[in-house]
Regions:
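An N-terminal assembly and electron-transfer interface module characteristic of large anaerobic redox
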Residues: 1, 5-190, 195
Length: 195
């Protein structure tokens, strides 16, 4: 067996996220920064996307270890683990769900997240699920339209996230009651302030 045989066996076809899918698919996004991503979710909803940011639980690491090789970095285990935990939970229609992740195109393993995710889906028998690469054109997905409105909303969410994070880090050392600062910038409070 040569390298050519291995290449032929691999399935390099991917499921493209189409405009038709955009209408009724739930797009799952890994939690990478709770303050920022909780604001990003409604920002993208206002642009017509049914985005759901997944919770990061202690159990997601176990799912990541099951579906990713042991040589992968810790963040990639968490990301793949969040996706697989959600998909295997029974909460989602596996024929009406897509996954989204950024793809840098750089030397970091973050570029390989797409491959890790697709491999995990294949191992679990879920190859029909589209994996959307949110990148500067590495992969095309007609159902993801990064237009001016979406870019502005996403940037606003990130800026608000930075503001809330700075407030939290500046006030936390002076808390009279531990955890009070975090309660004051909880998700409902943040969303009420920016809407």
């Amino acid at each position: 067996r040569g390298l050519g045989d291995v290449y032929k066996r691999q399935n390099f076809d991917r499921v493209v996220f189409t405009e038709e899918m955009r209408k009724d698919y739930t797009i799952l996004c890994p939690q990478m920064s709770p303050i920022h991503f909780d604001i990003l979710e409604p920002a993208l909803a206002s642009c017509g996307y049914n985005l759901e940011v997944l919770p990061s639980t202690g159990e997601c690491l176990d799912y990541g270890l099951k579906y990713v090789n042991n040589d992968a970095c810790y963040p990639s285990l968490l990301v793949v683990g969040q996706f697989m935990q959600a998909l295997l939970s029974g909460k989602y229609d596996l024929n009406k769900v897509a996954l989204i992740i950024t793809q840098t195109g750089g030397g970091c393993r973050a570029t390989n997240y797409i491959g890790f995710i697709r491999r995990a889906l294949e191992k679990a028998g879920m190859e029909q699920i589209p994996v959307i690469s949110m990148s500067a054109g590495i992969e095309k997905n007609p159902g993801l339209d990064i237009n001016y409105k979406m870019a502005v909303r996403a940037l606003q969410a990130l800026i608000y996230g930075d503001v809330f994070m700075r407030v939290l880090y500046k006030t936390r050392p002076y808390e009279a009651v531990p955890g009070l600062s975090l309660i004051h910038i909880s998700e409902p409070t943040r969303l009420a302030l920016i809407s």
